[in-house]
């Protein structure tokens, strides 16, 4: 950084300190704010709590300050909610007031400042985008149209693992093959396309760019420059890299998928009775003037991240827990063999008749919640919550992981025990009917992908357990399940090697 930039930063820092002191005095008189650590001018609580605002660190703060707390992160107010009652207020009772989204400097780049659906502010644009995306992606008709493809992709995973001699001996990193499966599941829906193998050059390019996008967006490393604008010059290279990755991804989506589908549509007109893939519906909305070309591309951006990665993380967590709990794996296999018959492959309609499989999926989503803080909410205007004033444009985090892992609310929550969803928690569902358990959120800004994720999880985990005995690699009694948290993500730190011994029927 050159000398002039350093001088400008120091001058801005001095001016901001004076301004922050004056503003804090004025605001202190106006608001009854939630409890939290005492902030200092400019930096707020950043020097005390740091950049790593993962679900476990926020849980520790909630134990100190209560079910609602306020962190002043530089110029941003961050409100953390850690009780079912307050979660209901944010997500349901005051769903309109807290229904907007806050973005940071990196997500502004990757979403075109909210031209997508997931990160746009609450209002007419969000309602329009939600409506346009619901029909081609998030209905039972879509499930019935594409479930045969999901079953075929799961069968292909089983076949490929069986063909790999290393799988039954030293083991393989099965996640790599499951990643291809998830891309094919979603690209069938989006573009009526699939990739033939893990070595497909286009798949490799897409996977690499999506992976880099996730790494950059989910990192805590850039928080300081987002929280404290006067430090943003230090992020210049980071933000430049984000823009480069974003531009490459958007261009790839356009050149290889959206424009290709446009060509098919222009040469082969489809009537309303023919099955269309999702992008056909979205392009129709563009032709009607409801959305623009950028909106189309950012919808594709959302699906590449939200639908593919989160479901893949959950599959990986579920397999890891079954490997580390062989008695649960055996019990699940017994249910599949008994109810379907040995060797009879599970299909989507079977999932609803397999209560223990459903319990395994629910327990995976409880203990290893892929989005443990949900996607952040925001109130556009001053609001009230839990008897406290919440200043306008506060970032609201619901610690959904703690709601589902609080020992005051759950029996031995640290244990992976699917039986809880057949016994004391038998009435709890993943759709948000109980505010202690919100793996997909609830209300206006809940994740609509639940309708796709649950059957894909059931089919995939079911097929693997039916066809293989899943074990740790030789010399290990368990596989590593250390976590890696992100801005609001939770996935397994190390992609484990797993032995998959084929069963004989």
UniProtKB/Swiss-Prot annotation:
The keyword Lipid metabolism does not apply. One of its GO terms (cellular component) is membrane. Changing residue 302 to F: Reduces catalytic activity 200-fold and cinnamate binding affinity 2-fold. Changing residue 103 to M: Reduces catalytic activity 2-fold and cinnamate binding affinity 2.4-fold. One of its GO terms (biological process) is lignin metabolic process. It is found in: Membrane. Induction: By light, wounding, infection, exposure to xenobiotics and fungal elicitor. Induced by magnesium chloride, aminopyrine, phenobarbital and clofibrate (at protein level). Inactivated by piperonylic acid. Its cofactor is heme. PANTHER family: TRANS-CINNAMATE 4-MONOOXYGENASE (PTHR47948), TRANS-CINNAMATE 4-MONOOXYGENASE-RELATED (PTHR47948:SF12). Belongs to the cytochrome P450 family. This is Trans-cinnamate 4-monooxygenase. It comes from Helianthus tuberosus. The gene is CYP73A1.
């Amino acid at each position: 950084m050159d000398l002039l930039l350093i001088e400008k930063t120091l001058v801005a820092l001095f001016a901001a300190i004076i301004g922050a002191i004056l503003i804090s005095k004025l605001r202190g008189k106006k608001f009854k704010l939630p409890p939290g650590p005492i902030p200092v001018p400019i930096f707020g609580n950043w020097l005390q709590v740091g950049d790593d605002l993962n679900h476990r660190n926020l849980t520790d703060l909630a134990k100190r300050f209560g079910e609602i707390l306020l962190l002043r992160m530089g110029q941003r107010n961050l409100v953390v909610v850690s009780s079912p009652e307050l979660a209901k207020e944010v997500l349901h009772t005051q769903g309109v007031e807290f229904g907007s989204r806050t973005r940071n400097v990196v997500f502004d780049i990757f979403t075109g400042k909210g031209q997508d659906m997931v990160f746009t502010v609450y209002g007419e644009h969000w309602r329009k985008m939600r409506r346009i995306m619901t029909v081609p992606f998030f209905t039972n008709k879509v499930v019935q149209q594409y479930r045969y493809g999901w079953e075929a992709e799961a069968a292909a995973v089983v076949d490929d693992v069986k063909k790999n001699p290393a799988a039954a001996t030293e083991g393989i990193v099965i996640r790599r093959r499951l990643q291809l499966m998830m891309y094919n599941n979603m690209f069938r829906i989006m573009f009526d396309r699939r990739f033939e193998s893990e070595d497909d050059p286009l798949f490799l390019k897409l996977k690499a760019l999506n992976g880099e996008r996730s790494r950059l967006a989910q990192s805590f490393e850039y928080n300081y420059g987002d929280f404290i604008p006067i430090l943003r010059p230090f992020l210049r290279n980071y933000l430049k890299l984000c823009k480069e990755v974003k531009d490459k991804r958007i261009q790839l989506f356009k050149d290889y998928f959206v424009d290709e589908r446009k060509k098919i549509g222009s040469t082969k007109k489809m009537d309303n009775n023919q099955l269309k893939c999702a992008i056909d519906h979205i392009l129709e909305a563009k032709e009607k003037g409801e959305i623009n070309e950028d909106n189309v591309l950012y919808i594709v951006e959302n699906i590449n991240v939200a639908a593919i990665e989160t479901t893949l993380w959950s599959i990986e967590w579920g397999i890891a827990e079954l490997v580390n709990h062989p008695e649960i794996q055996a019990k699940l296999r017994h249910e599949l063999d008994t109810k379907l018959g040995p060797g009879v492959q599970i299909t989507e309609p079977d999932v609803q008749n397999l209560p223990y499989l459903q319990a395994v999926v629910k327990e995976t989503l409880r203990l290893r919640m892929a989005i443990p803080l949900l996607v952040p909410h925001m109130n556009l205007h001053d609001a009230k919550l839990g008897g406290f004033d919440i200043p306008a444009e506060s970032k609201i985090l619901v610690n959904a992981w703690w709601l589902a892992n609080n020992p005051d609310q759950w029996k031995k929550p640290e244990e992976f025990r699917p039986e809880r969803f057949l016994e004391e928690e038998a009435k709890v569902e993943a759709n948000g009917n109980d505010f202690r358990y919100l793996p997909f959120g609830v209300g206006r800004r809940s994740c609509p992908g639940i309708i796709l994720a649950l059957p894909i999880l059931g089919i995939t985990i079911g097929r693997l357990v039916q066809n293989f005995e899943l074990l740790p690699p030789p010399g290990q009694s368990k596989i590593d399940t250390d976590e890696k948290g992100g801005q609001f993500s939770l996935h397994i730190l190390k992609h484990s090697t797993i032995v998959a011994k084929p069963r004989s029927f």
